[in-house]
A protein has these predicted regions:
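Short beta-strand element of the conserved SAM-dependent methyltransferase core
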Residues: 121-123, 166-167
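Membrane-interfacial hairpin junctions
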Residues: 35-55
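Acidic, Ser/Thr- and proline-rich intrinsically disordered linker/docking segments
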Residues: 147-205
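Alpha-helical transmembrane segments and immediately adjacent membrane-interfacial amphipathic helices
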Residues: 29-37, 62-69
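Phosphoinositide-binding peripheral membrane targeting modules
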Residues: 112, 116, 123-162
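Short regulatory "switch" loops immediately downstream of catalytic or recognition motifs
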Residues: 39-41, 101-105, 152-155
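Small side chains
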Residues: 25, 54, 62, 126-129, ...
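Anionic N-terminal interaction surfaces
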Residues: 1-22, 48-122
């Protein structure tokens, strides 16, 4: 996977994708899940245990997810837009890249001044973490403090799987868990993590 895809260009430009296609897809899936439940209630005699319970639970869980996920996306979109506004108001230099992250997945040598860090901007000076509440960077990692940029890995059923970006700094390791896009709650997979690592490495002056 190269770094010229549309998702990478949106991160370079700091674009939050519109929510309506995402919401429409969720509404469509919700309608399907509800339709399956109605069909089962009207025409299918479901056993009280075993596989029969799964026939009811699967569409029910699908319906619940179709409600919860769009709400999470709306919340993340609002949070990221505020963090972006703070970053743009505070910096006189346009970032070369925007890296949305999972706030709960950040690991740093020192406690963050704001645990709700939503994204990092990247420019010739380094990486700067932003939250929706602060007009100043809540995390600052200059390039001269970054020694290496690697993939963070973990053991997953006997296999090493990439789950984040590992920054080896002079103050200790910093681990970031990127999200797939601004305004989206989903974390990226190993293939996209490799692209993000390459983008960060190429951003170093």
């Amino acid at each position: 996977m190269d770094d010229s895809g549309a998702w990478v260009r949106r991160l370079r430009d700091g674009i939050v994708p519109p929510l309506w296609p995402f919401v429409l897809g969720s509404v469509g899936l919700l309608a399907v899940a509800v339709g399956v439940l109605v069909f089962e209630a009207a025409y299918v005699q479901v056993p009280s245990s075993g596989r029969g319970a799964g026939i009811v639970l699967l569409p029910l869980l699908g319906a619940v997810c179709c409600v919860i996920v769009p709400i999470g996306a709306w919340r993340d979109s609002r949070r990221d837009r505020r963090a972006l506004a703070n970053a743009r108001a505070a910096r006189d230099e346009r970032p070369s890249f925007h890296l949305p992250v999972s706030a709960r997945g950040i690991s740093a040598p020192q406690d963050l001044s704001d645990p709700r860090t939503a994204l990092f901007t990247v420019d010739r000076r380094g990486l700067f973490g932003w939250s929706p509440r602060s007009t100043d960077p809540v995390v600052t990692i200059p390039w001269d403090r970054i020694e290496r940029i690697d993939l963070a890995t973990k053991d997953d059923r006997g296999r090493r799987t990439a789950y984040g970006i590992w920054l080896t700094t002079t103050d200790g390791p910093v681990v970031l868990q990127p999200r797939s896009a601004l305004g989206r709650p989903f974390e990226v997979g190993p293939a996209k993590l490799d692209v993000l690592r390459s983008v960060l490495r190429s951003s170093r002056p």
